[in-house]
């Protein structure tokens, strides 16, 4: 299984429209960047590769990726550049299209979500071919990601 992670965005909801701030994947929680945390969880759960879709400040993301999983030691992280990253996450999803159509099992995730390890484990070990993680207590707001559920 491989993971495809969107990390190309400029973080408008966090930083505003005109920014040059670090990518959200480089925010630190308990001394680790989100990216470092994600890589640790994915490796522990047996994921073979992380395909990181980069754009905004890609050099910073790639430097962190190299620090976490050096290419010379087997290269767990492979990057794909989205030159149109300012156009939103749907373009990054399109950039990852080849990875998603490869026929491999794919875990698709955002880099800016603090995923609990137990939640990731449950998702990866699911017997279903396609599944989503859903917070049923979530109050929808302006967040652009929504999921409609039939009969429930």
Segments (PLM) and residue ranges:
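Alpha-helix termination/capping residues and helix-transition junctions
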Residues: 44, 99-100, 125
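Short beta-strand/turn micro-motifs composed of small residues
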Residues: 7, 54, 110, 134-135
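Short phosphate-binding loop-to-helix
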Residues: 60-105
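Residues at the starts of beta-strands that form the adenosine-phosphate
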Residues: 2, 48-50, 76, 105, ...
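Conserved core of the sugar-phosphate nucleotidyltransferase
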Residues: 116-152
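N-terminal glycine-rich phosphate-binding loop and ensuing alpha1 helix
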Residues: 1-61
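Short beta-strand-to-loop acidic/aromatic patch adjacent to the donor-nucleotide binding site
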Residues: 103-114
């Amino acid at each position: 299984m491989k993971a495809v992670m969107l990390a190309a965005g400029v973080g408008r909801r966090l930083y505003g429209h005109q920014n040059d701030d670090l990518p959200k994947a480089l925010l630190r929680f308990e001394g680790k960047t989100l990216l470092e945390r994600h890589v640790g969880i994915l490796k522990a759960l047996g994921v073979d590769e992380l395909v990181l879709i980069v754009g905004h400040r890609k050099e910073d993301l790639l430097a962190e990726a190299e620090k976490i999983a050096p290419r010379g030691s087997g290269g767990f992280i492979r990057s794909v550049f989205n030159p149109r990253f300012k156009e939103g996450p749907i373009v990054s999803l399109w950039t990852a299209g080849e990875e998603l159509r490869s026929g491999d099992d794919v875990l698709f995730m955002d880099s800016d979500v603090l995923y609990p390890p137990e939640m990731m484990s449950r998702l990866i070990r699911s017997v279903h071919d396609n599944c989503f993680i859903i917070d049923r207590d979530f109050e929808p707001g302006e967040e652009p990601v929504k999921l409609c559920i039939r009969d429930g």
